[in-house]
A protein has these predicted regions:
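Substrate-recognition "cap/lid" segment bordering the active-site pocket of phosphatases
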Residues: 90-93, 117-143
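Substrate-recognition element of Asp-dependent hydrolases with the DxDx(T/V) motif
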Residues: 101-125
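Active-site neighborhood of HAD-like aspartate-dependent phosphohydrolases
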Residues: 1-44, 55
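Alpha-helical substrate-recognition element adjacent to the catalytic core
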Residues: 32-62, 70, 83
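Hydrophobic packing residues within well-ordered alpha-helices of enzyme cores
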Residues: 25, 54, 98, 121-125, ...
Length: 143
């Protein structure tokens, strides 16, 4: 079977970026006088974007509390972005064989599709020397 293009997700597919998120979440929570959470909890909460991640952290649960104050969550999301901007790519690592796999696809057009914001995506890709592998990069805030 021949393919014309290879499409990739970023977080959890090419890159293990959970520790960066874990640090940024806990800096956000502690700054708002909320208890910090475990990396395991953060791992279970990722995958639905930053807003949901932050709301889950404020709720302390996978299920966002129906009583969560929108003003508080808005403030927390802004704080998270500030912390994450400092953390993105600091502890992220490529999964095993990613470089080999991308090299094996040299010559084939490759696109990266992620729900991560462009500013964070570009910073992460640059830090991990992945930018040049992709012909097209589509981010969550592009749509």
């Amino acid at each position: 079977m021949k393919y014309d293009v290879a499409l990739f997700d970023l977080d959890g597919t090419l890159v293990d970026s959970v520790y960066d998120l874990y640090i940024a979440i806990n800096l956000t929570l502690s700054g708002l006088a909320f208890p910090i959470v475990s990396q395991r909890l953060v791992e279970s909460w990722v995958g639905n974007g930053v807003e949901v991640l932050v709301k889950r952290a404020l709720s302390g649960d996978m299920q966002v509390s129906e009583h969560l104050d929108e003003s508080l969550s808005g403030k927390a999301i802004l704080e998270f972005y500030k912390h994450y901007e400092q953390q993105v790519g600091e502890y992220s690592v490529l999964y095993q064989h990613v470089e080999t796999g991308l090299a094996a696809l040299r010559g084939m057009p490759k696109a990266l599709i992620t729900n991560k914001s462009r500013i964070f995506t570009e910073k992460l890709l640059d830090k991990l020397a992945l930018t040049s592998h992709f012909d097209v990069i589509v981010c969550g805030d592009d749509m």
